[in-house]
Amino acid sequence: MNHSDTLSLSLELLQQPSVTPIDHTCQTIMADRLAKVGFHIEPMRFGDVDNLWARRGTEGPVFCFAGHTDVVPTGRLDAWNSDPFAPEIRDGKLYGRGSADMKTALAAMVVASERFVAKHPNHKGSIAFLITSDEEGPAVNGTVKVIETLEKRNEKITWCLVGEPSSTHKLGDIVKNGRRGSLNAVLKVQGKQGHVAYPHLARNPIHEASPALAELCQTVWDNGNEYFPATSFQISNIHAGTGATNVIPGTLEVTFNFRYSTEVTAEQLKQRVHEILDKHGLQYEIVWNLSGLPFLTPVGELVNAAQTAILNVTGTETELSTSGGTSDGRFIAPTGAQVLELGVLNATIHQINEHVDVHDLDPLTDIYEQILENLLA
């Protein structure tokens, strides 16, 4: 069977067991290909994370492909129908960890760039790649550190296409033009431990905190807007007690998360949480962690270039969306770049037997190449 350039490169990348934060030569494989067509290669290692900044051209505007070579752990190997790091094609589907999220997109980006450069060796502006091996993990030494480095030397990205698997039912039907912000908190409520038979000698933090937690759950934080759904508040963990049935716990720990729209700020959310907790008279400590600001790329050059390319290649009228979790776009957008996420179908990401339709790989490559044509030819 003759494999297309994109499928062949996908297979090579999928054979690398690059579980976060280990890159396992994926970036070297990509860099070798890019260097042959005139990209300046700049590896950037921070801590235990490998990052790649590759650029062809010295002028603006800068079009950047962004993505990650790391994958999530496989889960139980005996639950897979084939070795997750020995990619297999069965019934027109390519199976392997990272097939959807997001090594096939990385392959498509490289091949699209090779083809575009062959046709337009003197293209305007610059093409760049920002690739990390720590998107699925803590995301501390990955894209955010590369962006810090670029900002220090005033190297700006104009347009950024992140190859995250954005599609839902067919290739290109959904493009992410923004993401909600993500704000995490760990709340510790202080009570007084005691015997369940003598509640008057103790203070039960579960009982004391319950009305406040109920109010937090029922609060309408905002109503969203035309781009974002309403802000959501979700409790993810509650811990209290010694495990014994006759002991009132002394402390309660609650972990919760906000996925928030551009209608509120993280500071406003924090303030309202404190007001509710204080109103209920709780003795508490709270530790906040802002893992991503919301961002939005309005309709403009990048959105138009992507929508036109998708329509030309697939005939699909694409829909803009800001749903889903966070991505590394949250680190790139604050620099002023227009950011879009466009990739294969996301139905099996992070799952056992993760796979992608083989027949989507070449059209994705064509879409990426045509976006380059629309912006830099």
Curated annotation (Swiss-Prot):
Bilayer-crossing regions: none
GO molecular function ontology, one term from the record: zinc ion binding
Bound cofactor: record note: Binds 2 Zn(2+) or Co(2+) ions per subunit.
Pfam family, one: Peptidase_M20
Catalysis performed (reactions): N-succinyl-(2S,6S)-2,6-diaminopimelate + H2O = (2S,6S)-2,6-diaminopimelate + succinate
InterPro entries from the UniProt entry: Bact_exopeptidase_dim_dom, DapE_proteobac, Peptidase_M20, Peptidase_M20_dimer, Peptidase_M20A
Protein task: Catalyzes the hydrolysis of N-succinyl-L,L-diaminopimelic acid (SDAP), forming succinate and LL-2,6-diaminopimelate (DAP), an intermediate involved in the bacterial biosynthesis of lysine and meso-diaminopimelic acid, an essential component of bacterial cell walls.
Quaternary structure, from the entry: Homodimer.
Protein name per the record: Succinyl-diaminopimelate desuccinylase
Lineage summary: Bacteria, Pseudomonadati, Pseudomonadota, Gammaproteobacteria, Moraxellales
Gene behind this protein: dapE
